[in-house]
């Protein structure tokens, strides 16, 4: 499930992730590992971290210690330091580290573990480490029940708590998970973005990701753009635990394309769950409100080969993208040979994805309900609009207005979608992805 330790080193993107090698459902968690040169084509690698006497290997992050502050490498060959949650069978959660001297292929655990001991609470997990430009040291943010804690260290081994944030924003009682904190430049200044994943989100009662905009004073996050309503990173059902890549030029984020409500019941055999596309994050103003946008990354070479299509065009691949521009109300439909349909509705006030008739759904009582079949992103858009739809076997990722709105939805069609049709004044281009 959760992406872990996302990092870019020497032209290679590393995706570690929560992995149970013994079953297709959650269990004794390891860190799986995959690598890519382009964020689209991934190759599985040997398991990176195995459970030990401290417990399962839960979520965490990785940094490139270029100055060898940890002294686990050399100046000529700096180490990658992974920091993760050790989850003991009795529920105790503490933070541990491991280091790699071969660019992330293999890791050795520190004899100092745990480097952050539990302060006496449950749900104390998911450290996301980053360079602190204010104190010029390492910092991390981790989830602590319904809030996040901040820690600082000079060497990744000895940590001091520096602050807290939350609960704020979405006031539903639930646990925060998989936090991330990072700056994005906007009009010549850095705006700090805090992302938290929530096990239970407001009226929807499903997991979702919320973000806050503000500042980081070197010790804690300060929300400078409060909102009466939660600000969601994705309005769909199936994007959770997303975090950013370290050591990358752009701010790129990747999530788990699934929902805890039905993750253990999905009707798949060769895989269970998937990562989302990497998304390039930026800030933009929407109706005078500073807003986080997330546009798909890594698709440039495929978009260059896109071509216009007519209504009711046949699609000959299970992985493809659609670039759509239009104005006014519209309906877009992906169909297969047995009559199953994934429908997208667009208007000036909202975008709706309806998977009610999209495929096999009897595997879960949650997946079948209307509450888990129709996802909507509210918006205000007059005149022309644009969408990009990316479909990969069993997941749709929709991006509106270059990522201002996003909806991620998994579906399980009995046969591949092989036709696209629409109603409305639209211009549609198709590109195929050889993933």
What are these regions (language model features)?
Residues 182:
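Catalytic nucleophile-His microenvironment captured as a short glycine-rich beta-strand/loop
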Residues 187, 213-435:
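Beta-rich accessory regions
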Residues 60, 176-179, 240-242:
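Repeated scaffold domains used in trafficking and secretory/extracellular systems
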Residues 1-127, 131-174, 185-235, 257-307, ...:
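Beta-rich carbohydrate-recognition and catalytic domains
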